């Protein structure tokens, strides 16, 4: 891990320690979760691009991305304009997100919702369930193989889906050992934040056909989507290009249709 990812992981450990004091696991685990929606099936259905549309205010590499940031409104717009699923940044320190944003977005959509955060402790998985997450993100670069398997199995026992994210061939091989069909390839390095969408095309050859590849980061245009589809990659996690748009709904439609 490099300095950026180390900083995030270090802060996340502190954040989780505070959360555990404020609401111990035995209290959290007694809270009743709401309806869990099928994230995997939502990405499989029909042949148009399967877009996971992301609600993201800021990032460490780009700073503030969207000033006019209304989570409820954005969730509604994504839902009305063809997104298959939503992704919500819940990290406070580095992405100006908030756990409450997930619950709010879930209440304003019929779509399945991914919690986009840096999971380093099983506590966060129970927390994700209570917040309304239908799917969690596990980042291979943050976790060892035992953690990856334990966290994946725990989330699935709680009926959530798991998207496992990799950036290198080595990370991808580790991701493929997990019992989940959702394989995220992040075109942006979490070490230096450089982006190259060719990475998804290069790594696709190592992914079995029964998996669903989700290409993440750097997908900004209709041409980017067509390029990926020409290589049989049909699921996309898209945030920044939509968040920067004056008209989010039109921007999403433009990505999906000629």
Swiss-Prot record:
Catalytic activity: 1-(2-carboxyphenylamino)-1-deoxy-D-ribulose 5-phosphate + H(+) = (1S,2R)-1-C-(indol-3-yl)glycerol 3-phosphate + CO2 + H2O
UniProtKB keywords: Amino-acid biosynthesis, Aromatic amino acid biosynthesis, Decarboxylase, Lyase, Tryptophan biosynthesis
Metabolic or biological pathway, per its Swiss-Prot or TrEMBL entry: Amino-acid biosynthesis; L-tryptophan biosynthesis; L-tryptophan from chorismate: step 4/5
Keyword Lyase: yes
Any single biological process term in GO: L-tryptophan biosynthetic process
Enzyme Commission number: 4.1.1.48
PROSITE patterns noted in UniProt: IGPS (PS00614)
Enzyme class: lyase
GO MF annotations, alphabetized: indole-3-glycerol-phosphate synthase activity; phosphoribosylanthranilate isomerase activity
Gene3D superfamilies tied to this protein: Aldolase class I
A Pfam family annotated for this UniProt entry: IGPS
InterPro entries recorded: Aldolase_TIM, Indole-3-glycerol_P_synth, Indole-3-glycerol_P_synth_dom, Indole-3-GlycerolPSynthase_CS, RibuloseP-bd_barrel
NCBIfam families reported in the protein's UniProt record: PRK00278.1-6, PRK00278.2-4
Family named by the database record: Belongs to the TrpC family.
Protein's recorded name: Indole-3-glycerol phosphate synthase
Organism: Legionella pneumophila (strain Lens)
């Amino acid at each position: 891990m490099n300095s950026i990812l180390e900083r995030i992981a270090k802060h996340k450990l502190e954040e989780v320690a505070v959360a555990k004091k404020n609401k111990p696991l035995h209290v959290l685990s007694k809270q009743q979760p709401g309806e869990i929606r099928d994230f995997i099936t939502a990405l499989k259905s029909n042949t148009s691009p399967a877009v996971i549309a992301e609600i993201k205010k800021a990032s460490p590499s780009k700073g503030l991305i969207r000033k006019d940031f209304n989570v409820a409104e954005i969730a509604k717009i994504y839902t009305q304009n063809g997104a298959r699923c939503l992704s919500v940044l819940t990290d406070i320190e580095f992405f100006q997100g908030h756990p409450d944003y997930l619950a709010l977005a879930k209440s304003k959509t019929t779509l399945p919702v991914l919690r986009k955060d840096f999971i380093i402790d099983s506590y966060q998985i129970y927390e994700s369930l209570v917040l309304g997450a239908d799917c969690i993100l596990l980042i291979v670069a943050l976790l060892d193989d035992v953690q990856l398997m334990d966290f994946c199995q725990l989330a699935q026992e709680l009926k959530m889906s798991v998207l496992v994210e990799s950036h290198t061939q080595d990370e991808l091989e580790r991701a493929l050992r997990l019992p989940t069909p959702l394989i995220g390839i992040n075109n942006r390095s979490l070490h230096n934040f450089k982006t190259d969408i060719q990475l998804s095309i290069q790594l696709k050859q190592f992914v079995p056909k029964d998996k669903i590849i989700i290409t993440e980061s750097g997908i900004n245009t209709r041409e980017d989507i067509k390029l990926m589809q020409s290589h049989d990659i049909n699921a996309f996690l898209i945030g920044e290009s939509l968040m920067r748009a004056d008209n989010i709904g039109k921007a999403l439609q433009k990505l999906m249709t000629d």
